[in-house]
Amino acid sequence: MEKKLKKLEDKINYNFKKIDILISALSHKSFDPINNYEKLEFLGDRVLGIIISKKLLELYPNEKVGILDKKFASLVNKNKCYEIGKSLELDKYAIVGNNKKKTKVENKIISDCCEALI
């Protein structure tokens, strides 16, 4: 498992000081009802929102808020996070319970893992 997680760290160009955080970021509640990605996903979503908002204001300082809001919505959404998660092959790293292992990892889980990694 550690070798597999090291590959992911290499992909995202970040080495976790506490590997438990990475494991939690990849763990669905069906695997671990307590130490799963839900809170990290919540935080990641907020961090992503702040970063994208700041960048949009830098790139478009004179743009109307309505236009900025549309640009923001096109960049910060579950589909975009899914695309990024899929490009990182997070479906191969997601840790799910036995009831979820029978089928392919759902798009939402990939998207959620992506936000949790942020």
Predicted features along the sequence, with ranges:
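RNase III-family endoribonuclease catalytic core
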Residues: 1-118
